[in-house]
């Protein structure tokens, strides 16, 4: 039944499913901004082509190193999460791939139960069947929460740095990508030291993976 529901949800989805509640900008004829109309969430959708390559590399390096090799589920990471659950007696968010996180953010609640985790897995598999890896990354980076009311990396770039994501430096990109794992713990306003520490970890991951050089 859970699998059938996952198939139904993803089959009914399209690109617009992942663009809901976006912020609209009203421009004057000379190109100046007249007003900004916010949806339920403060979010600006940008295509993956408009994002710096470093944004994709950074988020994959910290959230889901095996993203381009799995089909929605990282079974080893999931097994580690199960072991931790058995030891601690509670369901944690660990073990979720980028695709599973997208499934949770778009189609499910944030409830931490095993049933929800199973639903997450089914939906993630269906998402991988229907959409390309680039599409999944685009949907993810436009919908994840970056704290302080900002949904999506463009909204976060404007909110924290007053710049478009395509204009961010590598350090700024890594800084933003540090936040979604735990927007409270890594809140740049109240816990900036934590954000900076995780940013440095991301940069080290990227360096170790050969995605950037010491010169960057």
Report the location of each language-model feature:
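Juxtamembrane regions of bacterial inner-membrane/periplasmic proteins
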Residues: 1-216
């Amino acid at each position: 039944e859970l699998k059938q529901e996952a198939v139904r949800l993803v089959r009914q989805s399209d690109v617009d499913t992942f663009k809901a509640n976006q912020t609209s900008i009203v421009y004057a004829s000379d190109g100046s901004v007249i007003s900004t109309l916010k949806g339920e969430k403060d979010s600006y959708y940008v295509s993956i082509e408009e994002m710096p390559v470093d944004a994709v590399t950074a988020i994959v390096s910290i959230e889901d190193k095996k993203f381009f090799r799995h089909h929605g589920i990282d079974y080893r990471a999931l097994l580690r999460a199960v072991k931790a659950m058995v030891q601690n007696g509670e369901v944690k968010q660990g073990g979720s791939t980028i695709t599973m996180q997208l499934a949770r953010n778009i189609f499910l609640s944030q409830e931490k139960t095993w049933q929800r985790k199973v639903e997450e897995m089914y939906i993630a598999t269906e998402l991988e069947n229907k959409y390309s890896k680039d599409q999944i990354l685009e949907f993810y980076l436009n919908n994840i929460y970056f704290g302080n009311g900002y949904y999506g990396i463009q909204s976060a770039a404007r909110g924290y740095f007053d710049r478009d994501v395509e204009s961010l430096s590598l350090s700024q990109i890594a800084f933003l990508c540090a936040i979604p794992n735990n927007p409270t713990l890594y809140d740049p306003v109240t816990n900036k030291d934590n954000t900076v520490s995780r940013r440095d970890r991301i940069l080290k991951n990227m360096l170790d993976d050969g995605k950037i050089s010491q010169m960057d």
